[in-house]
Amino acid sequence: YRRQRQMCIRDSLCRPQPGYETCRYVFFPGCQAGAIAPDVVTEAYEDLCRRTEGGVALMLGCCGAISEWAGRYEMTEKVNEQLKQELAKLGDPMIIAGCPSCMKQLKESLGAKVTGIWEILKEIGLPGQAKGLEIPVAIHDACGARGDTQTQDTIRELLADMGCTVVNTEYSRDLSPCCGYGGLTAYANKEMADKMTEKCLERSDSPYITYCMACRDRFVREGRESRHILELLYGINAANMPDISEKRYNRLELKEKLLKNIWNEELMMEKKDYTVAYTEDAISMMDERMILKSDVERVLSDYRENQEAIFDEETKELVTRSRLGNVTFWVRFVETEEGYLVRRAYSHRMNIMKRVGQ
């Protein structure tokens, strides 16, 4: 949870629409949308700015659900206070949420005025590029929408307006099962989360349409064609399943592009004079163990300064480590002409003590 929260903080952004100091609305797409389908976030925000009156601000970041699920209620309070301050600067606008869990969290934690982007699009009309799939689809209702009949109905109306044929499944609406992401199940018990995802997919062989980006990501990883409704509404098929590092990169790149293209602000990204490459095994291992490329690159940066590493005679690899926060990260790599090739990475909650003078 802590890693997720830290990434969301670093990738956060809050700006009023150009030409406004305060706004009638603020678009809050949710952290998973920016990580998985950043182009959808951009298209949706620009569309809202064009077709609504009174100004639409943009807020990228965490709604507080992650810390709430982790039982870190003191952190949730900090998130709430930060959100309240940012909203006050914008004139306490109505929040347009792109995620039902965000919508639920923001309503309950802040007592804020919140609506779903699906409600706004129902009111102002479909975007010009909206297009449904030509084959029957199944709807997966998000956990955050349980008890929210209005949201459930609106999603179905929008799909019908796009010409989608919806297949009824045995369990839907309030009985729709969790995809395995809710409550951070995928981080606490991966095997259980995988079983939950498989159970969801047993209901139909059709492509799944969701309105929660985390659900869409879980289903795609299991090999099922799945789209977030905003992908259909804005004619974008992200068609990917980014690993943990790619999700972080997508959020950072989204922030950088939006600042540059909409607010004419340059975000200075750190550049290195060497390259870090990864084997496919290393990438798979890092995603499984939730190790970011930025973690590995910080370890290698420390190695460049201290030149501390163990040489493995058998594999001809160098092994180095650094403690980041409360975790020690280990990297096995070889040096190349351009920089480094990472072959393995792992981590432990441990501290390596050095004896002075040895």
Describe the residue ranges of each PLM region.
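A conserved helix-loop-strand patch within extracytoplasmic ligand-binding domains
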Residues: 114-138
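Short, flexible active-site loops
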Residues: 133-144, 182, 279-282
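Ribonuclease/tRNase effector modules and their secretory precursors
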Residues: 243, 247-358
